[in-house]
A protein has these predicted regions:
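Bacterial N-terminal signal peptides
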Residues: 11-24
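N-terminal secretory signal peptides that target proteins for export/translocation
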Residues: 1-10
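Extracellular lectin-like interaction modules
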Residues: 31-442
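Sec/Tat signal peptide C-region and signal peptidase I cleavage site
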Residues: 25-30
Length: 442
């Protein structure tokens, strides 16, 4: 068991190599919406920070999508047309200096707003070969007034830092931040500070160091009006654990505390892991409590493996002999998954299974590197999948501890195996009888 807490706690898809994209809709982490707010992270140029772009999938009806920077009228809005049940993308690299949130500790005008004429799913991606990741945009369910920052403390940074970026959705938004580590600009751990942002303005909180202990886990952010937060951990040394020279970007858009759940299913991805779950070289599921007295239960057991205080984390290790785990918490919690391919790492905020999922998800394969996806659905839905309108058979297995209510599956294609999933086609995975959760690793 790995259980950690910062030394001071103040009371108060497509991407190359290691990224993970999780799709789910409604309740906890809805991603099908007509309005999205996003703060694009500053990614280390020294390790590669471009191309960057957005991808959109329509939900049965054609969509006209507008991308704007509300606080920066010098950047003209961009329009993207998405065909019915189709996928479209836009390269934003030309505007990278107007989009990425740099410097830290400064009020900026770089918030992105996406509006659509009909419901869509959307994600932002960094598509550089050696430092990619994807950020699933969560629409209205990314917006809230109370957040705690989750994260990892097992991999140091080779380039860049651990950071979180805030975007305001309304004028005169007062935001209070309590960091758990020293920030660039001299903000001290445990010392609250307040900023005021207008609609579309952003603020980046960036750790001052690159060590495993220079993380912002457990930091608090509260506001009087809805905000959205992007979390990154740039160029982490995955090779230090998973055998190799890999440095990779980890990132996702957070959900606020009021959207958190208490039941989660996580599938192991494709990292180079050990057979023994107690070995360091395993994938990690990281549970972070937001309330004191949060118990963590595994795989249907009635006995808690640990009890966490707010800001503490529990690491569930997943070796080759643990393909899936069912996690239940006694109080709402953040759950993150570190996964990827080989030693190339990515992470994602895991949606609670109380979230009903989606009956239709679109994705694209960016390159011919290794590609895979994971699927979780209720038992009644396992024989009802279609890919681009054609029946699609997937081999499912029951999730232990769920009384046969949930099943999981994974599909993997080797590098350069593009017979089924190529890099020029948009794909729609759908289910005719129910909803599902889809994770993309590419």
């Amino acid at each position: 068991m790995h259980k950690s807490q910062k030394s001071f706690y103040a009371p108060f898809l497509t991407l190359l190599f290691g990224g993970m994209l999780l799709f789910a809709t409604e309740t906890a982490v809805a991603q099908t919406d007509t309005s999205f707010w996003f703060a694009a992270p500053e990614v280390a140029n020294s390790h590669g920070d471009r191309p960057i772009g957005l991808k959109f999938t329509s939900q049965g009806l054609a969509a006209q999508v507008k991308i704007s920077l509300p606080a920066n009228p010098a950047v003209n809005p961009m329009l993207v047309n998405v065909p019915a049940s189709g996928v479209s993308s836009i390269n934003l690299s030309t505007w990278i200096d107007s989009i990425e949130n740099f410097p830290a500790n400064t009020i900026l005008n770089k918030g992105i707003h996406i509006s659509s004429s009909t419901p869509i799913t959307a994600y932002y991606e960094v598509v550089v070969t050696n430092n990619p990741d994807i950020f699933a945009l969560k629409g209205r369910n990314a917006l809230g007034t109370s957040f705690m920052i989750p994260g990892q403390d097992i991999m140091a940074n080779a380039h860049g830092r651990n950071a979180f970026d805030i975007v305001a959705t309304e004028d005169q938004t007062t935001i209070t931040i309590i960091p758990t580590d020293t920030l660039e600009g001299g903000r001290m751990p445990g010392v609250p500070f307040t900023i005021v942002l207008n609609k579309g303005e952003t603020f980046s909180c960036r750790s001052h160091g690159t060590n495993t202990y220079d993380k912002l886990i457990g930091s608090r952010v509260t506001s009087d009006k809805p905000i959205a937060i992007t979390l990154i951990d740039d160029s982490v040394r995955g090779g230090s654990i998973y055998n190799g020279g890999c440095f990779d970007l980890l990132g996702d858009q957070l959900i606020p505390i009021q959207q958190l759940g208490m039941e989660f299913i996580v599938q192991r991805g494709f990292l180079d892991v050990h057979n023994n779950n107690s070995n360091t070289r395993t994938e990690r599921v990281i549970v972070m409590a937001v309330e004191n007295g949060t118990q963590v239960f595994l795989d249907g057991s009635a006995t808690a493996v640990t009890t966490l205080s707010a800001g503490q984390t529990y690491h569930r290790r997943m070796g080759n002999n643990l393909p899936v785990t069912y996690i239940r918490t006694s109080k709402p919690a953040y759950v993150m998954h570190i996964t990827g391919f080989g030693c190339e790492t990515g992470w994602a905020v895991i949606p609670a299974i109380q979230c009903t999922g989606s009956s239709l998800v679109g994705f694209m394969r960016s390159t011919s590197e290794r590609f895979g996806f994971t699927v979780i659905t209720r038992t009644n839905n396992i024989n009802s999948f279609s890919l681009n309108g054609n029946a699609y058979g997937i081999s499912f297995t029951a999730v232990p501890g769920t009384n046969n209510e949930w099943h999981y599956a994974r599909v993997e294609r080797a590098a350069n195996d593009t017979a089924e999933f190529n890099t020029s086609t948009g794909y729609i995975l759908s289910n005719s009888t129910g909803n599902f959760h889809l994770g993309i690793i590419n």
